[in-house]
């Protein structure tokens, strides 16, 4: 059994999703969004760190999975996204959680079956896979998708290696 915290980082809205993986079964534990209110980036980064720390304290995950930075058309946006990811990752590392990263296309492939899926498709499939009564918010659905991707990737690694791979574990320690 493993509790997985998935993060969809953003400098204004950071989605989170928590699931429990027990064999092939995935159970929804919680999800939502950390919405930053500060005008300046350093204040928003502090809010992201505090929010992720609070979620870790509440759910006590075993694993932290986060979406990788993609190349944005706007370099400033990509830098801010990278800094938001950093705030979330530091919260995970401070809690001694192993950190795993997944590309957006891989996450969409794991959840929807195609790397080019849109947010609505991800929301629909996350709702279906976790048997949720309603579609989660877009950023929360993306974060749940990160957690589902990790669960599916971990199952594949276990099947291939006979045990969980630690190749990416502790990357930020």
Curated annotation (Swiss-Prot):
The active site is at 8, 67, 139. Its cofactor is Mg(2+). Its EC number is 3.1.21.10. Mg(2+) 2 binds at residue 67. This is Crossover junction endodeoxyribonuclease RuvC. Mg(2+) 1 binds at residues 8, 139. Belongs to the RuvC family. One of its GO terms (biological process) is DNA repair. The RuvA-RuvB-RuvC complex processes Holliday junction (HJ) DNA during genetic recombination and DNA repair. Endonuclease that resolves HJ intermediates. Cleaves cruciform DNA by making single-stranded nicks across the HJ at symmetrical positions within the homologous arms, yielding a 5'-phosphate and a 3'-hydroxyl group; requires a central core of homology in the junction. The consensus cleavage sequence is 5'-(A/T)TT(C/G)-3'. Cleavage occurs on the 3'-side of the TT dinucleotide at the point of strand exchange. It is an enzyme of class 3 (hydrolase). It holds the Pfam family RuvC. The keyword Transport does not apply. Keywords: Cytoplasm, DNA damage, DNA recombination, DNA repair, DNA-binding, Endonuclease, Hydrolase, Magnesium, Metal-binding, Nuclease. Binds 2 Mg(2+) ion per subunit. Homodimer which binds Holliday junction (HJ) DNA. The HJ becomes 2-fold symmetrical on binding to RuvC with unstacked arms; it has a different conformation from HJ DNA in complex with RuvA. In the full resolvosome a probable DNA-RuvA(4)-RuvB(12)-RuvC(2) complex forms which resolves the HJ. It comes from the Bacteria. It is found in: Cytoplasm. It catalyses: Endonucleolytic cleavage at a junction such as a reciprocal single-stranded crossover between two homologous DNA duplexes (Holliday junction). One of its GO terms (molecular function) is crossover junction DNA endonuclease activity. The gene is ruvC. One of its GO terms (cellular component) is cytoplasm.
